[in-house]
Structure formats: C-alpha cells, structure tokens
Curated annotation (Swiss-Prot):
This is Chaperone protein DnaJ. The gene is dnaJ. One of its GO terms (cellular component) is cytoplasm. Its main location: cytoplasm. Zn(2+) 1 binds at C149, C152, C201, C204. Its cofactor is Zn(2+). CXXCXGXG motif repeats lie at residues 149-156, 165-172, 187-194, 201-208. It comes from Campylobacter jejuni subsp. jejuni serotype O:6 (strain 81116 / NCTC 11828). Homodimer.
Length: 374
C-alpha cells in the first residue's frame, strides 16, 4: 500500500498550511543530503518529503489529491515547477524563509575571493597511555602545517590572476536537481569563491598553499582526559598576511585493564573472600599510586561500594584530587578438603541449620503451608 503525502510529513489530513510548513521544515532538515551523505535511503525519503510538500502546500493540488489521489496530479498542467517550490530559487531560499538570513540564498552564500584557502587553526590527535594521562608526561609531536603560497599570494593561480569560474558563472554555487527540487551546492570547481585559476601556480600546483613539517615538545598536564584539547600558540597554518594560527592537540587516552576512570574518580572491582566479608577485616587494595587499606565492616555484601578519599586523579584545572571507589565481589571456594568441609558443617550446625534447613526457612515454609490451607 502506497504511503500518503500526509503520512510522509507525519501530519493529519486536517493540517493547516502552517502545520504543513513546519512539518516539511523538520523532515527536510532530517533527510537533507548534506546531512546524510552517501545514505541512499535518506536521499529517497528527502525526495518524497519534497514531493509531498509541493502538493500539500498548493491549495489546488491538495484539493485534487484529497479527492482523486496521486494519479490525478499526473499531467494536466499539474507537474512540478522548475524549482519544485514555485517562488523559491533553491533550498537555501526556503530555509531562509523559515529561519531568516542565516541560511541565505545562493548569491548571499558566495565566498569572497579574498577568503583564505586554509584555516588558521588545525587539530591533531595525540594518543596517551592510561598512566600518561593520569600522571602527565612530556611528548614530542610531529605535525604538518600549511603556509599560504607567496608566489601566487594564496590564490593558486599563476601570477595570482583569477578568472570567473565557468562552471558556476561566478555565483559560487551550482544547482543540483533531485526529484521535485533543485537545490544549491558549493561549486566543486571553485569551492564557492566564484573564481578559478586559468593557469595553476607552478609553486603550489594550484592549491594556494605549501606544506611544511615541524615538531614540538609538549608538557602534558596531570589529569588530562580523552576529548580535552591543548592549544599550542603560533604553531598553526600561516596565512596570506603572515599571521600564524594555533595548533590544537586533542587527547585520546587509553583505557586500563584494572582501573576504570570517570572524570577524576577511579573505579575498581576487587575480589574479597567470603570469610573476610563476614568477619570484617582490613584488606589491601591496589590504587593508581600503589595500595591503600580498606576496612571492611562485618557482614559486607557482594557488590557493596566503598570510597577511598583522594585516591583518584588530580583535577587538570585545580589541586582537587578525586576518589577511588572500590566495589567488592565476594568469592566462595569451589572445592573443599575433608578438614574444611567438616569445619563448615560444624559452623552450619552452630547457626541452627539442621536437616539442610535454617529456622527462618522453616518458618517461611510453614507460612506458605498455612496459606494453602486457608
């Protein structure tokens, strides 16, 4: 069964124009190709969303569709317009009508020819071991940066001379049709500038920049963690005017087989023998700095957590130190010798367990038996 235009936009048949427009905006943003590159299913849904909107936003088409169905719209002068929106030049224009100038039309989104071909800043990833991140270290980083080509002044063109891009006619964007809609994409030939080199610069091969290698030693602070960034001043790319941006080092810290880190706190699961849990004993547990004493209370339970204050990680921005949380896992013997078995049987009897049943268990059975009798 073919899905209806109302179902495609997830609205009811009684929806007014404003509701239809809001629904279209939501669905178009969700399935837009720029957000779902390489996703064929999203591309197909995007086409359906636009098809549904073109019909339901037009009173005449909607009336015909409601009365006779989709087939009645084929032919008879009810085909799609050249743009698919009748009055909107491209997707940027309709988004602009919804959201304001931030989305802009193609003419407003053209890049300036004075724009840099390279960003001033860039990011490099740095992998650290668990200990390196927790305690800090020194690291040498080799990196590649870009320098705006002096020969062509960063244009990528021989002698720095550019001409109007023939593909987009200087607009910086080209129209791409998908079903009922024609939307604008950045021109692949000029990358949105509207200008292109007729002859490439021999020094930078038309890129507008040259690459160089460098290295720097970094002091990694104690307590750094995955996702954090360190800024290295004046180690970024070099622009046309000679200014140099910054390099940002993004940290990727490895996990540990024993300790689990959560911000500045450390978690560890530690095995405890059942007699230690019952009697309550002082035990030694490992920490990231060595070991610490944990005083177990009598009758400690499996999975119970205990906090060792200031045995965690130092906060990277202050002198505060996190805690270590120890979760105990109570262990029982899997095999017993004759002497151990005899001792445990005597212990069991001393707790009033006879005929394999404790007094509390007997009481529960009696309670259930009385329940059946009533």
């Amino acid at each position: 069964m073919e899905i209806s235009y109302y179902e495609i936009l997830e609205i009811t048949q009684s929806a007014d124009k404003e509701t239809i427009k809001k629904a279209y905006r939501k669905m178009a943003l969700k399935y837009h190709p720029d957000r779902n590159q390489g996703d064929k299913e999203a591309e197909d849904k995007f086409k359906l969303v636009n098809e549904a909107y073109e019909v339901l936003s037009n009173d005449e088409k909607r009336a015909i569709y409601d009365r006779y169905g989709k087939d009645a719209l084929k032919g008879g002068g009810f085909g799609s317009s050249s743009s698919g929106f009748g009055g909107f030049e491209d997707l940027g224009d309709i988004f602009s009508s919804f959201f304001g100038e931030g989305f802009g039309s193609s003419s407003r989104r053209r890049k300036s020819s004075n724009d840099e071909k390279i960003p001033s800043d860039f990011i490099v990833n740095l992998k650290l071991s668990f200990k390196e991140a927790v305690f800090g270290c020194k690291k040498n980083i080799d990196f590649t940066y870009k320098c705006s080509c002096k020969t062509c002044n960063g244009t990528g063109a021989k002698d720095g001379k550019l001409q109007t891009c023939p593909k987009c006619q200087g607009r910086g964007q080209v129209g791409v049709s998908q079903g009922f809609i024609t939307f604008a994409q950045t021109c692949p030939d000029c990358q949105g500038s509207g200008e292109k080199a007729s002859e490439k610069c021999s020094d930078c091969k038309g890129l507008g920049y040259n690459e160089s290698k460098d290295s720097v030693e970094l002091n990694i602070p104690e307590g750094i963690d995955t996702g954090m960034k360190l800024r290295v001043n004046a180690k970024g790319n070099i622009l046309k005017n000679g200014t140099r941006g910054d390099m940002y080092v993004k940290i990727i810290a490895a996990e540990d087989d024993t300790f689990v880190r959560d911000d500045d706190d450390i978690y560890i699961e530690f095995p405890v023998f059942f007699t230690q849990a019952i009697l309550g004993q002082s035990i030694k547990v490992p920490t990231i700095r060595g070991e610490a004493t944990l005083n177990l209370p009598k009758g400690a339970k499996d999975g119970q957590r205990f906090v060792l204050e200031k045995e965690g990680v130092k906060d990277v921005h202050s002198s505060r130190i996190g805690n270590q949380i120890v979760q105990i896992s109570i262990k029982f013997p899997t095999s017993l010798n004759d002497e151990q078995k005899e001792l445990l049987e005597k212990l069991s009897e001393s707790f009033g367990i006879k005929d394999g049943m404790h007094q509390e268990q007997k009481g529960l059975f009696e309670k259930i038996a009385n329940w059946f009798k009533s």
